[in-house]
Amino acid sequence: GGAVIMRAFILESCAALVWVMAAINLAFTVLLLRRYTRERSPILLCMGLIALGLFYDALVISLGGVLEGPLLAALSRMRFVSHGGLIPLLFPICAYGLRAGKPVLTGVWIFTALVMAAGVAEGFATVLELSRVGGITRYVSAETTPAWAETVGSLLSYGTVVPLIVCGVAVWIRDRTPTLFLSGFLMFAFSALGPATGNFDLIFFISMAGEICMVLCFHLYGVWASRKAART
């Protein structure tokens, strides 16, 4: 059926498609950081840094189609470290989106710094092993990775996106923009799509599509915020 054809297409085209995804992530990174330099809005800086981290993530996966050996291993190690260090920025994005007061923002940033430290530690502690799929060599977390690092990794994946969805609903109701909600919801939906369809070997690829949806929604939020500021 259609699912089988789609899977075959992804496996055949994977090595090329990940380069396209990396380029799209780079484009949104530039758009977000340029908007930040114009408007100096801290939420845009957080969004731009997450987009930058996701671009690096996609770039290293893309390089897995042409690179092997110690260089790819070192780049992959930094992929885990940057993911652990930057994804917690979703917490301040929630706080800025809700227009939280200074005491709440201070608390959120202290909490974020602690989660970042745990995320970076998790990135260095993760035991890497080779995985090959669709012409791409990737370093992934091995079964020998310490249990605490696995737990931190899982919390970073889901414990950051769920608050984004909840805060996104509140922002949607108050400000009438679904962009923050959709950024979290689409990321969560794509993360679940791989396991739900039984394509466990393609979870990384399907999640990359979710990441693009997330940074697209970040960009749309930035556009909305700019227009709102221009009207007031």
Language-model regions: role of each:
Residues 27-34, 90-96, 141-178:
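Alpha-helical transmembrane segments in multipass membrane proteins, preferentially the mid-helix core
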Residues 6-28, 154:
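Hydrophobic transmembrane alpha-helical segments in integral membrane proteins
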